[in-house]
Every structure is written in C-alpha cells, then in structure tokens.
Amino acid sequence: AVPGVRVYVPFSHGNRRSEGIILAVSDGSEYGKLKAITAVLDSEPLLSPEQIKLALFMRERFFCTVYDAVKAMLPAGLWFDDEGRTKVQDKTVEMTRLCVSPEEASRYAAAKRRRAPQQAELLEQLCSFECLPSRDLLKHTGASRQSLTALCKAGFVELYKKETFRRPETHLGDIEPLPVLNDEQQQAFTGINALAMSGKSGAALLFGVTGSGKTSVYIHLITEQLARGRSVILLVPEIALTPQMIQTFSSHFGDTVAVLHSSLSVGERYDEFKRVRSGKARLVIGTRSAVFAPADKLGLIIIDEEQEETYKSENSPRYNARDVAIYRCAQAGCLLLLGSATPDIVSMYKARQGNYSLFTLRGRYNDMQLPQVEIVDMKRELRRGNGTDISEKLREELEDNISRGEQSILFINRRGANKLISCGECGYTYKCPRCSVSLTYHSANRRLMCHYCGYSQWLDDSCPECGGELKHVGAGTQMIETELKELFPDTEVIRLDTDTVTAAGSHEALFERFRNEKIPIMVGTQMVTKGLNFENVTLVGVISADQSLYAGSFRAGERTFSLLTQVVGRSGRGSKPGRAIIQTFTPENETILQASRQDYEDFYESEIQLRRLQNTPPFSEMLTVTASGLNEAHVFQACRYVRDRLDNIIGRDGSAVVLGPAPLAVVKVNNRYRYRVIIYGKKLSGLRGIVSGLVIECCTDKRFSDVSVYADNDPAE
C-alpha cells in the first residue's frame, strides 16, 4: 500500500468496513496496536502527492476533514458501493481487428465468397480499416454474429475491449483562427503572458468593462500555454455559462477541452476526470469544483467573473475556489488570472496594493459604446396609476425593440409568480411551517412553495383565517412573464430560472432557441446577468434594482453594483447600440447611480472608504462559527459557549473582535434553528487552530449532542 490509494479498513468496535485513503506510510505508530487493512482497492494511486498536500492545506484552511477534501477532488463515480464495486465503471466498446496480413485476409475472402459471403464481406471491410467496433462492422456489412465468431475460431480476427469516454455534448467544428486583438487587448496579453511564462507563481487581475474582449485575451494566453505542453484550468461561475464557453473554446482548441460541472452524469464526470488525468485533455472548463481537476504540468488558472459568490462552497468543505487556485498556483509555480468587469473589492484592493498585477481594458471591443442607461422611479409610476411591475418607459422601449426585430432581456432576481400571498383584511401571510420565511406563489401549478426546504401546499381561494380576499405581493419571473404576455399577446416570451432549467442541458437549449429563433424577450434570474453574448440584444430591463441592495450583509452594495453592471452589459454587444432601463424605488441611491454610469472606479472609492470605517475585508479577516439544531435554546447555548471561550482566549491580547451569538437572516431552515458567532481580526491564522478545537469540543460535549457546529473561513453571508 502506498499514499494515494483507497483501502478498506475495519472501523470502530464492530469492525465496520469503511473506505479510506492512505495519506502517508510510516514504520512506526504512536497508537500502539493497530488493525490491519482489509483490502487495497487501487492498483495505482488515485491521488498524487500534490493532491494530498492540497487536502492537508484544505483541512487547515477550511475547517474540514481530509476525507471531505479528498471527496471534493474526486468524481462521485470513483467511490465503492457496499458490494465493493465502483459506482460507475469504465465504458468499453468491443472492437474487431485482423490477426493476419491484409493480403492473407483478402485471399481467404476470395476463397470464401461463394460458400460464406458474410465472412468474406467482414474480411474485406477489415482489410480497408484494420479495426472497427464490432457493432458497426456487423451493421455495415449485414453479417451475422455467427459469421464473426467463425472468423475468430479460424484465427483470422480477434475481439478485444477498447475504453471509450462518455463525453458531454459538444459541437466540434473546424478549428477557427485566433481572434484579432486590439491595441488595449494586445498590451494586456503581452503583460500577462510575460508573467505566465516567467515560471514563477503569482496573481494578476484583468479588469475590463463588459464587452471589452477579456475572452479573446484568455484564448491567446491559453494558446501559449498549450504550445508549451502545459495545462490550463478555466473557471466560470454558472453552469449556464459553460455551454457558451465550451463552444467558444472548442472552436479554437478542439478535443483537448474537458468539461467538469455538476450537471454532467456520473459517467461523464468520471470519464472527463480520466481524460484530464491522462493528459488527453489539457484545457479544463468548469464551475467551482473544476479547480480540483488533476491537470498535469499546470501553467495557468483563469477565474472568469471572479467576484461571483458561487465560487464559495456552502457545504463541507466550505472552500473558496480562488483560495484553492492561489494554493495550486503557488505549488505549481504558475499564474492565477482573475477576470471581471466588476472585480471583488478585496481583489482590486490587493491589485492596487501591488499584491496582484493589474491590467485594464477600458473600452469595448471594436469601439462599441457602453449601453445608455436610464433610471425609472417606480414611486412616480405608482402615483401615475401604473400598478404593474413594468414601467411605461420600459413598455415603450420593449415595443420599439419588437417592431425593429431586436431582442430584449429582463432581469428579476426572484423566481415564482409572487414573493408572498397575504390577506387584505386581517394581514395573514402564508409562511413555511419548517422555515422562518414566507411561501412563494407559483402560478404554473397554483402552489405555494418554500425555496429553502421544498415544502409546498395548495393556495386557498380565500384567507384561511378570516375568509378575506387574498392579495398577491411582489413579482417573480412567472408574474413578469404573465404581464409581458398580456402587454404583447402576439410576442413570444422565454423564461429562464431554476424552474425552467431542471433537466440537464435545458438552459443550453433555451439559450439556443433565444439566439437562433430570435425570440423577442427573455425574462430570467441571475442566469441572464453575466457572460452571455447575444449580438441582437439591444435592450436590458432591470425590474427591481432594490432587491439585493438592502440585504443584511456588508457586501450588499458590492453585489448590487456587480449585478446591475453585469446585466446592463448584456445589451449592445453587436453592431447596434444598447440601452438599459433600471427600475427602482430609490433612484437617488449612490450604488444604483454608479451602476447606471457603469463607473466601477467611483464605486470602488466609496466602498473602500466604507469598508475601512467598518473594519471589514480587506481591512480584516473574518471567521464564523455556526450552530444549528432542532432546539433553539441548545443552539444558542452552543454559540454562547464558543463566544465565552473565545473571549477568555482573545481577551488577553485583543487581537480580534468577537460578535454574537446572533441568529442568521433566516433563523430556521427545515426545522433547524441557526445561530452564529462572528470573529474579526487583522490576522486570524493563529486563531484557526483554536476555533477548530472549539468546534470539536462542542461536537463531543454531551450538552450539545443535538447541535451541529461548524466553522467557516470568509463566509459569503
């Protein structure tokens, strides 16, 4: 047994068979008598020494077990079931090939043509192709299986198994030439490529306005790395973006592209993993977990739309893909490139402090203009008697676009028909019995649903408390779709949210329909806000710019600015100028005004001053300890215990500030109450071990046996 292989071991007093991975081998042990390994499951290591080091780094950085870290790295199909079989097997195809020379096969075929014409036909086909899949060979010749078996027995052909890969659907065509770079792009490429070729680890930030052509710079950088025999990982924030990226990069790099994301089948993920590990695929494109791809000779990692919170995992291991990428680049001696039109505040701060190299694309490619943005005050719309969610200005612009044959995208960050249903008489509101949130109404099936736990129920005809009339409050994607169809009954509207893209590949199919059929209007959630490139889209409408602005997070302003800037940037990406309408109840809000001007520099200056006053990142680091359980009092007590212990430890040096316990914004989810303790400090690396120890204490303390406790480094919320 060697490090990196999986084994079965007898676990606990009952010697329950458990699967594990060997991390290291030693001649001695501090534990005295040890149990023997039951079985070694791999003939060669699944994990390289570099991956084992990464797992150990993740244990310390992200408060997880090594096993959790390893499971995040490996595709699900590699793990064994209770009978000792892997959950997904290698896919093979039966092949047929000649065992004799083509000349001898031809002579035998000529001799057999009258008495065994099928055998003759099989041999003649194989003389032309040498080897073929048995199924195709029989299909093309019309021969029977018995004829093929007879040739095997005669020693003229042999059957063997050949491994084949289950591949995600990609549209491979002719390889396209490299895109032509403008002066600004060329300057950025030259500088970044020099860093990538230096053989030293480092990080760079490519800050470019929407439509500036960051992808073209990526393509040139990847070309250079592949030419050197190096591998590249490209991360995208959303599965919805992956098909477009695959199409773009496959047109330049062909079959060397591998795809890794959660919408693939288990078999596809397993086979793509093997293609990367074997070196058959050297450009990996995927979402957050693709950062673990076993790419050999890593030359570059690119994180596109690096500010997106989807790069942070909310389940164990609670890693940030950017942190993992920084570690991998440091170990491999290569460059990490962060790209965005609205960089994370911390990333831009590091770039301005000189920790990252900064490259800027200030203009759109081919001198296209940024969209013209107009803010609409929805309070004024209400005073004018317009009680719908679509302002008069947006309606007029949509009408103009439809008449010109141009397309429009409308964004609202809430799926369903209505945010909530309430009684106009007594004020009763439908709430989830398992979570501390209101139920969202879905008109398609006339059900009220909880978007946290999945609970649903039918909508009553009248208030269940007093029998009064029910009011529909707050619009979602379904309601906007309905309003659009009422305004434009002869116009097709396509909706894009998690309710319409449940099946694998369904988002890709919707995007293709929108692009190819020139459907006039698309309405959707965050899936439509970033990375998409539709040349005929000349109008973007933001239904409610206020939704994310007043969330209880110090990042609320940053997320709102990024969201608005990104969605506005979907307009005018072709030869026609773009427009955008932002609807809001707070038109004087500074963040909304900055987003309407697409002025990141101004937003950064005001936001960094606020962060400095608040002492929030990048001016401090942040850890949280979260407890959850069915008994709210026990959950609070567990957090109180952590807070008291930290106060005793930190109180001696004042190196950090401890806040809480406090309930999360949604305190109850699926009948479990959630409280947390927040720790701020200039440098918290010394506290991580202490916090980890406190989490273990809580998990083993009988007083908190019904409470789950975990720590998180730099949480998203």
Predicted region positions:
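Short helix-capping segments at alpha-helix termini
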Residues: 253, 488, 649-654, 701-703
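C-terminal effector/interaction modules appended to NTPase cores
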Residues: 670-672
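Extracytoplasmic/periplasmic
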Residues: 633-648
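Accessory, non-ATPase domains that flank or precede helicase/AAA+ motor cores in DNA-metabolism machines
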Residues: 1-340, 352-368, 678-680, 685-692, ...
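Accessory RNA-recognition modules of RNA-modification enzymes
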Residues: 130, 667-668
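Short beta-strand elements
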Residues: 649-664, 705-713
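Inter-lobe coupling/hinge segments of SF2-like helicase ATPases
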Residues: 175-182, 186, 190, 200-636, ...
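Hydrophobic, Leu/Ile/Phe/Ala-enriched alpha-helical segments that form helix-helix packing faces
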Residues: 484, 567-571, 646-650, 694-702
